[in-house]
């Protein structure tokens, strides 16, 4: 299920499939909600409202996402945490490293690993040069930061 789209604004080249909170997908939302609750309580202490949006991103060769933040106006203003789960083993693709601005080395997490960070942290995905890289990306929502 889900809606599939292709976006390329010179900043991003990824396939995107939105995952709706239907009965067949609820187990994903429930698992992520449990993880987000524990991590938020331990590390961030952000006010969350239980709402979550979820996409699968596909990066094929030449796929990338340049420097950006996940926070913005309108519907993007209530994002409180970005949650990225690696669906592809790192040996299945080349390139596609996750980088954070001024935060050290490029990240190449293992399949099944999840990275959680505030949506105001600038980050990017380097171009994939071989294979395909799939990630499950979620945003936990709450009152907009002030």
Regions found by a protein language model. Name each.
Residues 48, 73-81, 128-130:
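A generic structural micro-feature
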Residues 56-75:
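Conserved short histidine dyad/triad with adjacent acidic residue
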């Amino acid at each position: 299920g889900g809606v599939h789209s292709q976006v390329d604004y010179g900043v991003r080249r990824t396939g995107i499939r939105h995952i709706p909170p239907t009965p067949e997908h609820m187990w994903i939302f429930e698992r992520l909600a449990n993880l987000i609750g524990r991590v938020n309580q331990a590390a961030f202490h952000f006010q969350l409202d239980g709402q979550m949006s979820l996409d699968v991103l596909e990066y094929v060769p030449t796929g990338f996402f340049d420097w950006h933040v996940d926070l913005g106006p309108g519907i993007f203003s209530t994002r409180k945490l970005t949650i990225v789960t690696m669906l592809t083993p790192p040996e299945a693709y080349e390139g596609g490293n996750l980088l954070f601005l001024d935060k050290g080395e490029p990240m190449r997490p293992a399949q099944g690993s999840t990275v959680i960070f505030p949506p105001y942290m600038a980050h990017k995905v380097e171009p994939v040069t071989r294979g395909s890289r799939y990630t499950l990306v979620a945003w936990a929502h709450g009152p907009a930061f002030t």
